[in-house]
Amino acid sequence: MQVSSIELDSVSKRFGSVEVISELSLTIHSGEFIAFLGPSGCGKSTLLRMIAGLESVDGGEIRIGGERVDHLPPGARGVAMVFQHYALYPHMTVFDNLAFGLKNIGTSQDEIARRIEEAARILEISHLLKRKPGQLSGGQRQRVAIGRALVKDPKAYLFDEPLSNLDAALRVRTRVELARLHQQTRATTIFVTHDQVEAMTLASRIVVMNARKVEQVGTPMEIYGRPATEFVARFVGSPAMNFLPVSIRDRGGLASAVLGDGSTIDTDVPVNALPAGGELRVGVRAEAIHVRPDGALPGKVEVVERLGDRTHLHIRLTDGNTLVAEDKGVSQVQPGDTVRLAVEGATAHLFDDAGLAYHARQ
């Protein structure tokens, strides 16, 4: 199997007067599984289509395996794309759907049979080869679409929201199958999604995009644990990170975040790293906020969401702000209860009025 790096060097794209990608640079290493994650309209699918050759590049260069390809047609780039819609030929068997692209480029019958046999084994669809798409479930059709890419032996796989049409249970199963497929093939893979769970569980690195630019590139736990911006902190994680307006008190060189009611959250963020002036917000994830009798932060429970192994508590603080705390196991807390909260300040982040994040030293 071919495995190639992909390099984007100051790539730009315009639709009329609207710039949708602006001088974006990124290196995807050979064998990496990269997720492009972001909301609708952020440019992630456009960027994928530029790599595939389905959209032109208005500036910069794209290189695959060290070779510049942005001037080449899609078929000459050595990539295989799997779309949200399966795009299978309904009148053909699964075998013929898998073979179609290979026949068009003159691949021998023996080689076609060998590749299809191998792809069918990996994807566990050998028993489906004589069926037509109408006889398959949604998950089976998606595996056939992936198989059609697999038999091409490409330099890289490009997935454009391939799980969006599947129901929740099937989406989980197919996600596991994709992870297993990458472990077996170690193929360079780009996966476009708006679903943070797909990105977090599948990718070795995530490219978080917003408003046609890259907000952050990092491993899933870097993105989750040390978000570069407020957008990333809000977009990744469920429930979203809590944000509360604060003033800062110096605590031996570290920042204590003072809330509106005078209570404090002692962070490990260095005071000298913070900007002078401007508004600041403390950001804390729900799992770092606990109901405890000795907690420093008082509040009233408004909504209780019981999720089985954990409970999310929506709490209004005495200064009027709200947050979500997580209670492990079967919580005894009820709506209307007054509680006290303890916050793990070591995991807290601070954000300035431009949305930039400040973290504890590593």
Protein language model regions, located:
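Conserved ABC transporter NBD signature motif
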Residues: G60-R68
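ABC ATPase nucleotide-binding domains
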Residues: F33, P74-F231
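The feature captures the beta-strand-to-loop junction immediately N-terminal to the Walker
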Residues: L37-P39
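Helix-to-loop junction immediately C-terminal to a conserved catalytic motif
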Residues: A52
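ABC ATPase nucleotide-binding domain
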Residues: E7, T27, R63, R340-A342
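Non-catalytic connector elements of ABC transporters
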Residues: P239-L244, D250-Q362
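Pre-Walker A (P-loop) beta-loop-beta motif of ABC nucleotide-binding domains
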Residues: L24-A35
